[in-house]
Regions:
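Mature extracytoplasmic or organellar-lumen-exposed domains after removal of signal/transit peptides
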Residues: 22-423
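Bacterial signal peptide processing site
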Residues: 17-20
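C-terminal motif of bacterial Sec signal peptides marking the signal peptidase cleavage site
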Residues: 12-15
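Sec-dependent signal peptide recognition
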Residues: 2-7
Length: 423
């Protein structure tokens, strides 16, 4: 994954060579149009890479092998890069937020899906289906709820299993369900190492851990659903689509408010809080975002890049094409030059802090290692990211004030606002 980081860094430098004229007047409606263009491009890339993931998984299932499983894993990792850059569109856009749970829900109680180690346990006070293991069982019966799972299909996953019994941790679809099926559980705790699922879990001739036929069906179904869901979101951003229509209905001020809501909520409540600070407080690897693959460092990095994309009005496609146009950054420099300079400094500090985390991961010190108890160096690296994101959010709030925007609600997190309730 270091290749992708280096590619993106190079693209950011290249983008600087085509920096727009910041002295030219900027039409706020054109800024919103650029925001839409980037949504179309980044969700389009998410769909392209999901289709490549599907093709890789289909090849693996046709001829299971260790090499085939590794290729599928690499395709999954590549698919995460454009998708994570879309997450700044989640908050403030209700169409995206309501849809997002189908593709990126976490954390998940993986025992709903497949076999787990003894250390996982068999019961949860909050989830009757904590260890239901649908791959091994054609009928699920718990807490008065019965599910006929004789046929594993996209419909079963989407309509019956996902968030079964109203429990959010019953994640049956999306990137993280596929991640678990490719890697298996990460049993290394806060030590180096990720999931070690054998390729033979998908072999019909040399099946390990039983039910390989149903496991194959589940993996294929989950991947089909991911592609279908991303196709839906791509259409949502076309003219006349639900996300596009909702955004346009908000008007100019509402559109700008949506952009800043997405940036601030991702930076503060979601990324700094729920995805980073919470895991650090609990020293719990179960709180890391891509916990089976240990790809969390990259997911966090590209979330931060997504925030920058929205502000700078530019996005580098997987093809290498640069999508850009009139930007929020240009608008801010016109209205409040000092705040604009401050925001650029905040973005640079966040990128620097994130890059340090990625560098540690390349040495085997992935996010779950960094948040381990008594890892003072790891804590310092992660805390610097949290601090940078919090400062970034404070500057976003200044931008909101300078642009005289209203109805901007930046989401918080107990891990930042009320940490005492975590314990």
């Amino acid at each position: 994954m270091r290749y992708y980081i280096l590619l993106l860094t190079a693209s950011l430098l290249a983008a600087c060579s085509s920096t727009p004229d910041f002295n030219a007047p900027v039409d706020p409606d054109e800024v919103i149009a650029t925001y839409v263009d980037i949504a179309r491009a980044s969700y389009g890339d998410s769909l392209i890479t999901a289709r490549e993931l599907e093709a890789s998984i289909n090849r693996f299932l046709a001829q299971p092998s260790a090499a085939g499983l590794e290729q599928a894993k690499q395709a999954w990792l590549a698919a995460r890069i454009p998708y994570q850059q879309t997450e700044a569109y989640r908050f403030g856009n209700s169409v995206v937020d309501e849809w997002e749970g189908r593709v990126n829900s976490w954390p998940l109680d993986e025992g709903l899906i497949d076999y787990t180690a003894d250390s996982y346990g068999t019961q949860s006070d909050f989830n009757y289906f904590y260890s239901a293991n649908v791959i091994a069982n054609e009928i699920l019966d718990a807490g008065g709820v019965v599910v006929d799972a004789a046929v594993i299909s996209p419909q079963l996953l989407a309509e019956e299993l996902h968030q079964l019994d109203g429990v959010e941790a019953n994640v049956a679809t999306g990137y993280h369900a596929i991640e678990f099926l490719l890697w298996g559980q990460d049993l290394h705790g806060t030590s180096p190492g990720n999931g070690e699922r054998p390729w033979t879990d998908y072999s019909l001739d040399n099946c390990t851990n039983g039910n390989c036929d149903r496991r194959r069906q589940y993996l294929a179904s989950a991947t089909t659903l991911l592609v279908n869901d991303l196709e839906e979101m791509v259409q949502n951003w076309q003219e006349g689509g639900a996300a596009y229509t909702n955004l346009m209905a908000k008007g100019t001020q509402g559109g700008l408010a949506t952009m800043l809501t997405g940036m601030g909520s991702l930076a503060y409540g979601e990324l700094a809080g729920e995805r980073i600070r919470l895991g650090l407080l609990l020293n719990d690897p179960e709180e890391e975002h891509d916990c089976f693959s240990d790809n969390t460092h990259n997911s966090h990095y590209y979330d931060a890049v997504g925030i920058r994309n929205v502000y700078m009005g530019e996005y580098r496609r997987v093809s290498g094409e640069l999508v850009n146009g009139p930007s929020l950054s240009q608008l801010v420099i016109q209205e409040a030059p000092a705040v604009s300079a401050e925001m650029m400094a905040r973005l640079e500090e966040t990128e620097f802090a994130m890059t340090a985390m990625v560098a540690e991961a390349s040495r085997g010190n992935t996010f779950d290692v960094l948040i381990g108890r008594d890892n003072t160096e790891g804590e310092a690296i992660v805390t610097r990211i949290v601090d940078a994101l919090m400062e970034e959010t404070r500057t976003i709030e200044k931008i909101i004030n300078e642009l005289a925007l209203t109805n901007v609600n930046i989401e918080g997190s107990d891990s930042l606002d009320n940490p005492e309730v975590i314990f």
